[in-house]
């Protein structure tokens, strides 16, 4: 069942999947950013014994922006998630959050810990926590500059390169020539738009966000930080380990990679069956 709610500057669409039998367990919410609800179809299918909540972040999918702001912040996304949880019957929920969604979930728990029983934050790309924070931040800013100058194709090429790069990000990363965008099926010409949900709206605010670790440490929420078994040394994996270290917990290794829960969404195949089993093990 799909519903919508009004939030400052946006209309947020969200979905409720009800279990076949009355649920006795905590509702499960699945979020990404800028990944919308369509990325969680496979994973949701492994939790038919729970009420499952998904949503489209503002400016993605069915969630339309009603303001003229060029960017969205993790705090804004966190407030949107709060509204969805409260509109869906209130918390607490168990929350699985992937990538940028994990960044937003950390902001949510810092502000509203009572809404989340267990947070599983899978590979949040918080580059300012890395040992190579300076060059990593320069690279992220460089990708945004490419987008502003040349549009989606060249910037997305460098984004793909940075998220798959293993090890510390070298100086001048974004200045090195990238592959032909057509190699990745990306446009080689600039259509003039600058409202891409990833490159325009969320790249800087997400990657440069610094969680409130004091608030997170004192939160009653159980926080589990996940990293992929096959994404070792990639930026988001390393950032996930950095978040875990700041929280004083050991990261939990999930099967597959950064997108391990995908079962064909966006043409990507992770290893969703063992991934879902690992998530269930944590939540149960």
Name these PLM-found stretches.
Residues 59-94:
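Active-site loop/oxyanion-hole signature of alpha/beta-hydrolase fold enzymes
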Residues 135-142, 146-250:
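Alpha/beta-hydrolase
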Residues 56-60, 125, 257:
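Short beta-to-alpha linker loops that shape the active-site pocket of alpha/beta-hydrolase fold enzymes
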Residues 91-130:
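Conserved hydrolase catalytic core segment
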Residues 247-284:
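Catalytic active-site module of serine/aspartate enzymes centered on a nucleophile-bearing elbow/loop
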Residues 6-65, 70:
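Conserved HGGG/HGGXW glycine-rich cap/lid loop of the alpha/beta-hydrolase fold
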Residues 30, 95, 225-227:
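Structural beta-sheet core signal
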